[in-house]
Regions:
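Alpha-helical interface subdomain recognition
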Residues: 1-82, 101-105, 117, 133, ...
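Short Ser/Thr-interspersed hydrophobic loop/turn segments at strand-loop and sheet-helix junctions
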Residues: 51, 75-79, 175-179, 203-204
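Solvent-exposed alpha-helices and their adjacent loops that cap or buttress functional pockets
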Residues: 90, 113-115, 131-133, 148-152, ...
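Flexible, small-/acidic-enriched active-site or ligand-binding loops
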Residues: 146-147, 176-213
């Protein structure tokens, strides 16, 4: 395994950082946080024009045909800049589910729109979503909590369980987010992150909306979730790297007791420990991305990366607030932007404890 970046990946990382430093300072992040949509359409369109929304999609679906590692490089910079919007939800998770499905009609209908930013697709995977059959196709009913960006989504992919007496496993269906009998209620969240309760009231769906076949959606869902976890870990890594840079800069500038606080051993240890944590997390994240790119089993590697990213989130939050001290707990300071998003990422797709349990189970086998 060679985790050094290719020349193209280095260019992608550098140009992404330059673009985001100019187009997405923390003032833009704060503006998006206060908005109803949770993202800024102008910035979204600019990222689409750069090809970022279709990095890992094939060219025949409007993407640029990059690898998961390419996407990981990009999202490390996206996380570093706290870029708001449904990139992970639509451009990674939903796009991958569609790409893995055997439904060519839905691929052609949705993937080009995801890549050019005109469509936003989200995922609902609550335990209370059920599908059953009727004379014309299937019926979707139930509700799902924590559906990200449902308020601005054009389509919702629903991961459903079978109703009593129906098929034996998960069925994936795609529905128009503005269809009748779909009700969306915004939920309270950290950093005003746009999550919704989505309710589906016995919606009739044709078989053309089924992704991957009746009761055959679990493999596509699991594969997409693995890739999404790697990308989310890359975002966490980028945020932690930026926090490290912030605290090192501040420690060198802040003078107390007649000298910079960077000369105090306790502060040095905080910064050094965070540097080690960032580097070790980066190795695990890129290892998981590499294995998935090689079509190798990566369940354990993804769980290790996710667990380490969760621990890194806490390390970065603790180091940042400890070095910046009291001012970092105010909403005016940028540190709270990083710590609030760290908590969201740690809880998403299974928290640190869950993934440590997954690793333990694998070791015991």
């Amino acid at each position: 395994m060679d985790f050094s970046l290719t020349e193209e990946q280095q260019i992608l990382s550098r140009t992404a950082r330059e673009f985001l430093e100019a187009e997405c300072p923390t003032t833009v992040v704060r503006e998006a946080e206060k908005s109803e949509k949770g993202y800024l359409p102008d910035l979204w369109k600019k990222m689409a024009n750069l090809g970022w929304l279709g990095v890992s999609l094939p060219e025949n679906y409007g993407g640029i045909g990059g690898s998961l590692t390419d996407q990981t490089v990009l999202f490390e910079e996206i996380g570093r800049a706290l870029v708001p919007g449904p990139l992970l939800t639509s451009s990674v998770l939903a796009a991958q589910i569609l790409l893995d499905s055997r439904n060519e009609t839905q691929k052609q209908n949705l993937l080009p729109g995801i890549a050019n930013g005109e469509l936003i697709v989200t995922l609902a995977r609550g335990e209370r979503l059920e599908t059953s059959s009727d004379d014309t196709g299937i019926v979707l009913s139930g509700e799902s909590l924590f559906v990200p960006f449902a308020g601005v989504a054009s389509h919702i992919i629903c991961a459903t369980r079978p109703a009593v007496g129906a098929w034996p496993d998960t069925t994936l269906v795609v529905v128009d987010a503005d269809a009748d009998k779909i009700f969306k209620t915004r939920m309270g969240s950290i950093a005003n992150y746009p999550q919704y309760l989505a309710e589906f009231d016995d919606i009739s769906i044709s078989l053309e909306a089924v992704l991957g076949g009746i009761a055959e959606g679990r493999p596509s869902l699991d594969a997409a979730l693995q890739r999404a976890m790697v990308i989310q870990c890359a975002e966490t890594l980028g945020r932690a790297q930026k926090v490290l840079e912030m605290v090192v800069q501040y420690a060198g500038d802040r003078v107390q007791f007649g000298r910079p606080i960077a000369t105090f051993q306790a502060v040095q240890h905080r910064c050094a420990d965070l540097k080690v944590a960032v580097d070790s997390c980066r190795m695990l994240v890129y290892q998981a991305a590499w294995r998935l790119d090689q079509d190798m089993p990566a369940h354990n590697e993804v769980s290790m990366a996710k667990a380490k990213a969760g621990i890194l989130s806490r390390n970065a939050t603790e180091a940042g607030h400890s070095v910046f001290a009291g001012i970092s707990f105010t909403v005016e300071h940028d540190m709270q932007l990083y710590s609030s998003r760290a908590k969201i990422s740690e809880a998403n797709f299974g928290d640190t404890g869950y993934h440590l349990d997954q690793i333990s189970i694998a070791v015991e086998r």
